[in-house]
Curated annotation (Swiss-Prot):
Complexes and interactors: Component of a phosphatidylinositol 4-kinase (PI4K) complex, composed of PI4KA, EFR3 (EFR3A or EFR3B), TTC7 (TTC7A or TTC7B) and HYCC (HYCC1 or HYCC2). Interacts with PI4KA. Interaction with PI4KA is direct. Interacts with EFR3 (EFR3A or EFR3B), interaction is direct. Interacts with HYCC (HYCC1 or HYCC2), interaction is direct. Association with the PI4K complex is strongly reduced by TMEM150A.
Subcellular location: Cytoplasm; Cell membrane
Keyword Lipid metabolism: no
Protein name as it appears in the record: Tetratricopeptide repeat protein 7A
The entry's keywords: Cell membrane, Cytoplasm, Disease variant, Membrane, Phosphoprotein, Repeat, TPR repeat
GO cellular component, one term: cytoplasm
Result after altering A832T: In GIDID1; reduced interaction with PI4KA
SMART domains in alphabetical order: TPR
Length: 858
């Protein structure tokens, strides 16, 4: 009975030894070795003659104990020197007593030769690892050749032997890489490279099988214990981690994209274990990087298809996979398969993001500082790739939602704050973006790009001019520390002053701000004399204060640097029109539209120039082109999934939807049946306009600029129809615009003009008043209202309204002309003459459209 009990104890210790070697519990090895030796001593009852698993004599047990202790000592030494191993720094035996002791044990075992072939082979594998870490790469390769690792089988072997073999293959590959190349021939080098990749691929597969089997065994043993007792997470050793990733890293480094991607996809398809979760995040991030940076959409192949033949021919498989036991893969019906590289990269990154953000170390205690830094770097790298991926598809809302999830661990992390801020800018959440940028300024106060970005947003979409001025002053206050961004700081401040001048209601304030704007912009030009953007805005500022000749000189300099700039060409056309060279202006606009066919501002200027030069008929034809451009750029399928005909030829028809609908009569001559040129233009415009019938539910979809542009097209067409006295057609156009924005001041103003042309003066006056209520600074509205009040006999009130208009915009010659007419009607001839002279002087330098239509933005 005693012998039977001792035999059971021996089996239990032996099983525990195998488990500890597989799971890496090296601190338990000395105690287990002592128990084993005690049981194996004569009289201990553990000598099991005839047992295939442990038929040791006492000297054999002593050598077996040395093997176990040598492995434990070496693994503990490697754990203590993980950083050096990672940096490929050889460990010196004299500085590492554990490694020295392990080497002595292993040398003794191999010299005695008393152990069974299995354990002698294990000793060689462990000694090969030791040779590698001490920098003896040839000795490591020789030891693995002596052990015969290429012919080893994994069938019916203990788990720890899988780990040893996986590490052996990766170490052999790393050792081959580090051998000197001076003597070897090119053929031998190529052969060696192939052998390295073969070693890495074998190591990867064996490591994955080992980790899957280890988790299965651990879970089974845990299930036999109490519920709620969870197995400890297995910590990957350096060499196991290298085994998992060396194959795809080596292939990608050599330019073998097909094999590298195949390795990565295989790794990601294997059934994961707890130990490989972090590794899979890294692999997914790596594959996403390859898909984004190294593979075009034309060369992409899905995980379930084969790569292009030209790729297949170059990269043959380097080893026979049939001989290896494959890890378990995720399989099943109806698995999702990406259609292109962006889709696959996005899928990988979204999965990686969910795992990485879950594992981020939030604790700020000093002991976890390094872990926190590493986890944050991994998460930030994933978000950077997500920014690239979603940015390519314009999915900025989705990107901002992803980045917002990072805010829970972004405390003090400038890069993440800045990424979130930029994503908010891109998806149109400008106010939120400015709030985030304020925090970024606090985190990095010496970085001029952050306040510049904030100023750009404030100037552009928000028009928060006081905040823009504050941010611009931040950049300027940095002085020389701002470097190349200092001129941009002055540019931002100059544009802010210019916009403030446009918004100012008092002429004295306008003049002061225009002066400050010009001085600041000229300072920016002194700092960056060849910057075309700075020169452009100096020219624009000169144009705004009607220094037309000086503005033209500056603009010529800007065009020398950037000949095809849309804003510069647009300003040139407006300057020509201010000099009354309308044909030159039209030629410039046509040239600019050739370069920038989707620029609506240029198209509207062309309509105005044609209206002045050729009359409303030609302008209506261009209006039709603008409407078609709108339809092309903002198709119904993008907005609401409506049907849309792809053809834009004559006779275009499409299925009409309920909602807005425009029908323009053909304006036939009833007697002769002939059609005037204006009627032809009108019918063509009707043809284009009738295509744009849409449900009102669509109107709130898409950016606001989309619909304000369409409103402007309708109102421009209405103005041209009114000039031709086609009042019914004009009414339909205004009705369409009103369907978009019923209370828009532009719509109310145009309805007032239509009522005025029809002779409904009281209605016109009321509509002008409503428009002025919506837009109290509308000079054009004030002008029309003033003249209407004068016609109705309210001379004093008309004079007040027109004086407000010229005070609000002192360069509006129409307002001066109207004020002169009212003063003349009141008998104030001298004051009227002054107004007429001012109007005449201003009209001589007035463009067809205000210079302020040129966007002032960074």
């Amino acid at each position: 009975m005693a012998a039977k009990g001792a035999h059971g104890s021996y089996l239990k210790v032996e099983s525990e030894l195998e488990r500890c070697r597989a799971e890496g519990h090296w601190d338990r090895m000395p105690e287990l070795v002592r128990q084993l030796q005690t049981l194996s001593m004569p009289g201990g009852g553990g000598n099991r003659r005839g047992s295939p698993s442990a038929a040791f004599t006492f000297p054999d047990t002593d050598d077996f104990g040395k093997l176990l202790l040598a492995e434990a000592l070496l693994e503990q030494c490697l754990k203590e020197n993980h950083a050096k191993i990672k940096d490929s720094m050889p460990l010196l035996e004299k500085n590492e007593p554990k490694m020295s002791e392990a080497k002595n044990y292993l040398s003794s075992i191999l010299n005695h030769g008393r152990l069974s072939p299995q354990y002698m082979c294990e000793a060689m594998l462990i000694l090969g690892k030791l040779h590698y870490v001490e920098g003896s790469y040839r000795d490591a390769i020789s030891m693995y050749a002596r052990a015969g690792i290429d012919d080893m089988s994994m069938e019916n072997k203990p788990l720890y032997q899988m780990r040893l073999l996986s590490e052996a293959f990766v170490i052999k590959g790393l050792s081959l890489e580090r051998l000197p190349n001076s003597i070897a021939s090119r053929f031998r080098l190529t052969e060696r490279e192939e052998e390295v990749i073969t070693c890495f691929e074998r190591a990867s597969w064996i490591a994955q099988v080992f980790l899957q089997e280890l988790e299965k065994t651990t879970n089974n043993s845990t299930s036999r214990h109490l519920k709620g007792c969870h197995p400890l997470d297995y910590e990957l050793t350096y060499f196991l981690e290298a085994a998992l990733q060396s194959a795809y890293v080596k292939n990608l480094k050599k330019g073998n994209i097909v094999k590298g991607m195949r390795e990565l996809r295989e790794v990601l398809r294997t059934v994961e274990t707890k130990a490989t979760q972090n590794f899979k995040v890294m692999a997914a991030k790596h594959l996403a990087g390859v898909l984004l940076h190294s593979l075009s959409e034309e060369c992409y192949w899905s995980p379930l298809s084969h790569p292009l033949p030209e790729f297949m021919g170059k990269e043959e498989s380097s080893f026979a996979t049939q001989a290896l036991r494959k890890p378990h893969l995720y399989e099943g019906d109806n698995l999702y398969c990406p259609k292109d590289n962006i889709e696959e990269a996005l899928l990988l990154l979204l999965i990686s993001e969910s795992m990485a953000t879950r594992d981020v170390v939030l604790s700020r205690v000093p002991e976890q500082e390094e872990d926190r830094t590493v986890s944050l770097q991994n998460a930030a790298a994933i978000y950077d790739l997500l920014s690239i991926t979603l940015g390519r598809r314009g999915q900025y809302v989705m990107l901002s939602e992803c980045l917002e999830r990072a805010m829970k661990f972004a405390f003090g992390e400038f890069h993440l704050w800045y990424q979130v801020a930029l994503s908010m800018v891109a998806c149109g959440k400008s106010a939120y973006a400015v709030s985030l940028l304020r925090e970024c300024v606090k985190l990095r106060p010496s970085d001029p790009t952050v306040p510049l970005m904030a100023a750009k947003v404030c100037i552009g979409s928000l028009r928060w001019l006081e905040e823009a001025e504050h941010f611009a002053m931040m950049v300027i206050s940095l002085g020389e520390e701002a470097g190349e961004f200092l001129p941009k700081g002055y540019l931002a401040l100059g544009l802010t002053y210019s916009l403030q001048a446009t918004d100012a209601t008092l002429k004295s304030k306008q003049d002061e701000l225009h002066r400050k704007a010009l001085q600041t912009l000229e300072r920016a030009q002194q700092l960056a004399p060849s910057d075309p953007q700075v020169i452009l805005y100096v020219s624009l500022q000169l144009a705004l204060v009607r220094q037309i000749s000086s503005a033209m000189e500056q603009l010529q300099e800007a065009l020398k640097v950037r000949k095809d700039d849309a804003h510069a060409l647009h300003l040139l056309a407006l300057l020509f029109s201010a000099q009354k060279h309308h044909q030159h202006a039209l030629d410039v606009v046509n040239m600019a539209i050739t370069e920038h066919p989707e620029n609506f501002n240029l198209m509207f200027t062309k309509v105005k120039l044609e209206q002045v030069l050729k009359g409303p008929e030609e302008a209506l034809v261009t209006c039709r082109q603008v409407l078609r451009l709108w339809q092309t750029l903002y198709s119904f399928s993008q907005l609401g999934g409506l049907e849309k005909d792809g053809s834009f030829g004559e006779g275009l028809t499409m299925k009409k939807q309920s909602g807005m609908h425009l029908t323009l009569p053909d304006a036939h001559d009833a007697d002769s049946g002939s059609r005037r040129a204006s009627s032809i233009a009108a019918s063509r415009l009707e043809e284009a306009m009738s295509e744009l019938t849409m449900p009102s539910s669509v109107l709130k979809q898409g950016p606001m600029q989309l619909w304000t542009t369409l409103e402007q097209i309708w109102l421009q067409a209405a103005e041209l129809f009114m000039e031709q006295q086609h009042l019914k057609e004009a009414g339909f156009c205004i009705q369409e615009a009103a369907g978009l924005f019923p209370t828009s001041h532009s719509v109310l103003y145009m309805r007032g003009r239509l009522a005025e042309v029809k002779g409904n003066l009281e209605e016109a006056k009321q509509l002008y008043k409503e428009a002025l209520t919506v837009n109290p600074d509308g000079v054009r509205i004030m002008h029309s209202l003033g003249l209407m009040l004068s016609r109705l006999g309210h001379k004093s009130l008309a004079q007040k309204v027109l004086r407000d208009a010229v005070e609000r915009q002192s360069t509006c010659h129409e307002a001066w002309q109207g004020l002169g007419e009212v003063l003349q009607a009141q008998g104030q001839n001298e004051a009227a003459v002054d107004c007429f002279l001012t109007a005449l002087e201003l009209e001589a330098s007035s463009p067809v459209l205000p210079f302020s239509i040129i966007p002032r933005e960074l």
